[in-house]
């Protein structure tokens, strides 16, 4: 049984706006959202009711609302909730794509609900939606070396050794979102989690 109902679907990439953050680990969600839009020939436009940037794409065989909040990561929840309300998307049909410290760099995992793992963007989304029971595409960035502050680590650009692999990670994130919509959570997890 697919986890997504026949209601509208909202796919959100999390990140920070502006060129200073464009290539940081924390902006992986934005990078995957940009890739999904480009693959469908779509362009993000300001969404007046939410303040986010949004577009509509075909993904997993259906029309999907794709968005990037335009506030900073830690306050992205209200824009996500406003989009969900505007498009009549239940929380179980909201898919949030985000960087994940608790996964090795390059790993992609799918999840429904659960904790935020210290991710303030997810915390903001959970508070604004009034539930943690939404879908996540978790994009592994790994833990910082030594005693480096994780908050500083995610705001840095990728290490030189990682940079060449970022496009593949974004492709896999985009594929994971599509499988999630097409197959539902469990079947999509079976495929995505076998990627390594």
UniProtKB/Swiss-Prot annotation:
What does the sequence similarity comment in the record state about its family?
Answer: Belongs to the PTH family.
Name the chain's protein: Peptidyl-tRNA hydrolase
- Is the tRNA-binding keyword given for this protein? yes
> From which source organism is this entry?
Mycobacteroides abscessus (strain ATCC 19977 / DSM 44196 / CCUG 20993 / CIP 104536 / JCM 13569 / NCTC 13031 / TMC 1543 / L948) (Mycobacterium abscessus)
Q: Which gene encodes it?
A: pth
Q: Which CDD domains match?
A: PTH (cd00462)
Q: Which residues bind tRNA?
A: 21, 72, 74, 120
Classification via Gene3D superfamilies: Peptidyl-tRNA hydrolase (3.40.50.1470)
**EC annotation?**
3.1.1.29
Keywords tagged on the record: Cytoplasm, Hydrolase, RNA-binding, tRNA-binding
Outline the subunit composition: Monomer.
